[in-house]
Amino acid sequence: MSAIANSAVLVRLNISVWGASKRNKELEHEVARNKKADPQAMRMYDNLMVGSTGHRDVQRHAAQSRLWHTGLTLPWDERGYRLCPTSLFIDYKSQHNVKRATFDRLVDTFRVKYLGYRETAKEYRGDIFNELDYPPLAEVMEKFCWNFTVAPVPQSGHLYVDLPEQELEEVRTSCDQEVERKIAEASKENEKRLLKDCLLYTSDAAD
């Protein structure tokens, strides 16, 4: 078994979220006509969830989770698999479980409030509101997905695996340093957020 197969695993994280937007060609043509412009010169999209935060909360958490995943792993192949050192995997998996639970909770909140969000958007969208822009709830919920896969590092067939031991050791050292750097950056960012929260709390208490 190759040394790298003993010291790392492959992980893949795919997160999808309903876009909650729709291109408004009718409005494009109207604006183009009023401005004496070609409709092809613009793209206008309606925010179907304007006025509420539920969908934005899901989007934000999904984006942060993707960045977190990228920050603790290294590229492996074009299929989306990334390399995670076994020394970090337990902590990685623990954090993953928390982030997935948060995603599921946010998505479930969105599911419960979807119709209410649509009514709120109706107030904001005015004359451009169209009931047909909003898919049935079941169809919308199919757009939300969190897929996580763990796989062993193959014995051969990849540059990292087939490298001679000396070159592989150099790659391994470089990877370890990169992972450590990313962890340090993430820790500093968490410290900044914690300090900011403490300052806000202190300010509120003083008021």
Q: What do these predicted regions represent?
A:
Residues 1-121:
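Leu/Val/Ala/Ile-rich N-terminal alpha-helices, chiefly Sec-type signal peptides and the beginnings
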Residues 201-207:
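Conserved small/polar residues in nucleotide/adenosyl-binding loops
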